[in-house]
C-alpha cells in the first residue's frame, strides 16, 4: 500500500472540482465553475459538500485545478460542512509534482488516478465519485445501501430525461433488475432515457485496477464515461443503475445557471432549500439585515443579508450586498454579490457578476435572450443598451 494508513474508512468521496467552465463565459474568467455563486447565498460546490455531510460521509477530497483561489478560500478547513475533522475531513487536492514528474489532470479518471495515494491512506471499501458543478440534493448512503444489496462492482446514479433530450447525455441501458448492459455516450438514437448524473460508487480495489490499466492505454481519454465505464462493462463487471427522482441540474451553461436560479422562485420549489431535514450549508460573511426603502417593491424574489433595495425587483435573485437604486427595475435577473445598480437602471433577463457597477440610466437585456455582465465590470453611459456581453438563446 502506498503511503501511511491514517484511519480505515468504509467510503471516501472524491469531488471533481477542477473544471474551467468555459461555457459560462465571463462568469468563470477568474474562478472555477464550482465556485460560481448560486441561489442568493451559496456557491455550487456547497451542494455536493452538504450532501456528503448529510449522508454521513466525512472523508472528502476536492480535486481542484483551474483558478482555485476563491474555491479554496470558500472551503477553508471545512468547518461549515462539519468536515473540519482530524480523522478524515476535507482535503484540497490540486495536481502536483511527483518523483516521476507531474501533469495537469487530463480527464476525470486521470484525476482520481493521480490521487490514489490519498485514497489508499484510508483503505476504503468504496469510493464515491462526484461532480462539483451540479445542483441537487441526494442521500448517498441510500445509494451505497443499494450498491451493497445488489453486490455491484459499480453503481451509477441515473435520472430520467425527456427522450428528445437524451442524446445530450451518457445513456445507461438497463435490464429490469437495473443491471446495466450497455452505455452510450450521447447517442444519436437513444434506446432509453436513463441519463448518467456523473455520480458513481465503485468497489475501490476494482476501480484502482481499472484506473491503473487505463493510465497505460495511450489511446484513452482517461474519462469515466468514455473509458472506465465501457471497459468495466466489456470485462463483465456488474454495473447497477441507481434511479434518482429529485431535482438535478447541470449548471454548466449560462442558460442552465439562469434557469436553476429561476427554479428557486417557483411556489413549489423542487430543490426545497427550506427543508430543515437536509440543509445546504455555505460559508457566508456576516452582513447586516437587508433594507427595503419606502418606495421599493419586491415580488417573487430572493433577497438576502446586506441588500439595500430602493427600486423594483421582480422574479429575481439578489445575493449579499446588492444595492438597487431609486427608480431601478430588476426583472428575471440574477444579481451576484456586492453589485451596485444605480438609479433608473432597467435590467431584464440577465446575470450580473459579482462587484459589478451598472451606472445610472443604463438598460441591460431585452427580455428575450440572457445578457451577462462580468464580475467587476462597470457599465456606463446614459440609457446605454448592453446586449452583446454573452448572449444565449
Swiss-Prot record:
It catalyses: alpha-D-glucose 1-phosphate + ATP + H(+) = ADP-alpha-D-glucose + diphosphate. Keywords: ATP-binding, Carbohydrate metabolism, Glycogen biosynthesis, Glycogen metabolism, Nucleotide-binding, Nucleotidyltransferase, Transferase. GO terms for molecular function: ATP binding; glucose-1-phosphate adenylyltransferase activity. Disulfide bonds: none annotated. GO terms for biological process: glycogen biosynthetic process. SUPFAM superfamilies: Nucleotide-diphospho-sugar transferases (SSF53448), Trimeric LpxA-like enzymes (SSF51161). Alpha-D-glucose 1-phosphate binds at residues 105, 170, 185-186, 196. Pathway: Glycan biosynthesis; glycogen biosynthesis. InterPro entries: ADP-Glc_PPase (IPR011831), ADP_Glu_pyroP_CS (IPR005836), GlgC_bac (IPR023049), GlmU/GlgC-like_hexapep (IPR056818), NTP_transferase_dom (IPR005835), Nucleotide-diphossugar_trans (IPR029044), Trimer_LpxA-like_sf (IPR011004). The keyword Transferase applies. Its EC number is 2.7.7.27. It is an enzyme of class 2 (transferase). NCBIfam families: glgC, PRK05293.1. Belongs to the bacterial/plant glucose-1-phosphate adenylyltransferase family. Homotetramer. Involved in the biosynthesis of ADP-glucose, a building block required for the elongation reactions to produce glycogen. Catalyzes the reaction between ATP and alpha-D-glucose 1-phosphate (G1P) to produce pyrophosphate and ADP-Glc. This is Glucose-1-phosphate adenylyltransferase.
Amino acid at each position: 500500500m502506498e503511503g501511511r494508513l491514517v484511519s480505515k474508512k468504509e467510503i471516501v468521496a472524491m469531488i471533481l472540482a477542477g473544471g474551467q467552465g468555459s461555457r459560462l463565459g465571463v462568469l468563470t474568467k477568474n474562478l472555477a465553475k464550482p465556485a460560481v455563486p448560486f441561489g442568493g447565498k451559496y456557491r455550487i460546490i456547497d451542494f455536493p459538500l452538504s450532501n456528503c455531510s448529510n449522508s454521513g460521509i466525512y472523508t472528502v477530497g476536492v480535486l481542484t485545478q483551474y483558478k482555485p483561489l476563491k474555491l479554496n478560500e470558500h472551503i477553508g478547513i471545512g468547518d461549515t460542512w462539519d468536515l473540519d475533522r482530524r480523522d478524515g475531513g476535507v482535503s484540497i487536492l490540486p495536481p502536483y509534482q511527483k518523483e516521476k514528474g507531474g501533469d495537469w489532470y487530463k480527464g476525470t479518471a486521470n484525476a482520481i488516478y493521480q490521487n490514489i495515494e490519498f485514497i489508499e491512506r484510508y483503505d476504503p471499501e468504496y469510493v464515491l465519485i462526484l461532480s462539483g458543478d451540479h445542483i441537487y440534493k441526494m442521500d448517498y448512503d441510500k445509494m451505497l445501501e443499494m450498491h451493497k444489496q445488489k453486490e455491484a462492482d459499480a453503481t451509477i446514479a441515473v435520472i430520467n430525461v425527456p427522450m428528445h433530450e437524451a442524446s445530450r447525455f451518457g445513456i445507461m441501458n438497463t435490464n429490469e433488475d437495473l443491471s446495466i448492459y450497455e452505455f452510450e455516450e450521447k447517442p444519436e438514437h437513444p434506446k432509453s432515457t436513463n441519463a448518467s448524473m456523473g455520480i458513481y460508487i465503485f468497489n475501490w480495489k476494482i476501480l484502482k485496477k481499472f484506473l491503473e490499466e487505463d493510465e497505460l492505454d495511450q489511446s484513452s481519454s482517461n474519462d469515466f464515461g468514455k473509458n472506465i465505464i465501457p471497459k468495466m462493462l466489456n470485462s463483465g463487471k456488474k454495473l447497477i443503475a441507481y434511479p434518482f427522482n429529485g431535482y438535478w441540474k447541470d449548471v454548466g451553461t449560462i442558460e442552465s445557471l439562469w434557469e436553476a436560479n429561476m427554479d428557486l422562485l417557483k411556489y413549489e420549489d423542487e430543490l426545497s432549500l427550506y427543508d430543515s431535514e437536509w440543509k445546504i450549508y455555505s460559508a457566508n460573511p456576516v452582513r447586516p439585515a437587508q433594507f427595503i426603502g419606502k418606495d421599493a417593491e419586491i415580488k417573487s424574489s430572493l433577497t438576502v443579508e446586506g441588500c439595500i433595495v430602493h427600486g423594483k425587483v421582480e422574479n429575481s435573485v439578489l445575493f449579499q450586498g446588492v444595492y438597487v437604486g431609486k427608480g431601478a427595475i430588476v426583472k428575471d435577473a440574477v444579481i451576484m454579490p456586492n453589485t451596485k445598480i444605480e438609479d433608473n437602471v432597467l435590467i431584464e433577463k440577465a446575470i450580473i457578476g459579482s462587484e459589478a457597477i451598472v451606472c445610472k440610466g443604463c438598460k441591460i437585456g431585452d427580455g428575450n435572450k440572457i445578457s451577462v455582465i462580468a464580475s467587476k465590470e462597470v457599465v456606463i453611459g446614459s440609457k446605454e443598451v448592453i446586449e452583446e456581453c454573452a448572449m444565449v438563446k
